[in-house]
Design a protein with these regions (language model features):
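Surface-exposed peri-terminal alpha-helical interaction modules
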Residues: 2-177
Length: 177
């Protein structure tokens, strides 16, 4: 937990203290709560709201809901691994090995993407909250496991890449069948 530095002082890693202590519970509950809220929304109100969208916005909604689900499942996996280490079910080395399978870099379309303004407010709130949670978890992961644990240090929020956005929309549109 503490690393020796020059002069004999020890560096305290706040993220490590938070993750491997009782103060991890609120973060875990927040993450799992967001997973549950997103699932309820997407299976209920979100499904009804998506039917009211234009074709373009509906395609964007479908792509973003997949990104949202992927992002939340990756964050949930990370949280579950940390909880397992915290409760003694796994060693930190086991967690470090398993967490290499977890990706904390699921981006979202840029908010000026065509159709973004039509997306339901509740859905956009879930996307924003999931991006914030992912960014927090990613920073904690980087502090605990080192900068090498995260390959792409570019902020994840909403990357502007019009070509990628259009390819994603086309893939979603033609995958409907």
């Amino acid at each position: 937990m503490n690393e020796p530095s020059k002069g004999g002082a020890k560096t305290v890693k706040l993220a490590e203290r938070r993750v491997f202590s009782q103060s991890f519970k609120p973060l875990y509950q927040e993450g799992m709560g967001l997973v549950e809220q997103a699932a309820e929304y997407l299976d209920g109100k979100g499904r009804a709201e998506a039917k009211k969208l234009s074709r373009l916005a509906a395609t964007l909604y479908a792509a973003e809901s997949m990104r949202l689900t992927t992002r939340l499942m990756q964050v949930a996996s990370w949280l579950l691994l940390q909880r397992a280490a915290n409760s003694g079910e796994m060693t930190r080395d086991q967690v470090a090995s398993e967490k290499s399978k977890v990706r904390l870099d699921t981006a979202s379309a840029h908010d000026d993407a065509a159709g973004w303004g039509e997306l339901p407010a509740d859905f956009l709130d879930l996307v924003t909250r999931s991006l914030r949670l992912q960014a927090l978890v990613r920073r904690m992961d980087d502090e605990i496991y080192g900068a090498g644990a995260v390959l792409d240090m570019q902020p994840v929020a909403r990357r502007t890449n019009p070509v990628s956005d259009q390819i994603s929309l086309l893939n979603t549109a033609f995958a409907r069948g």
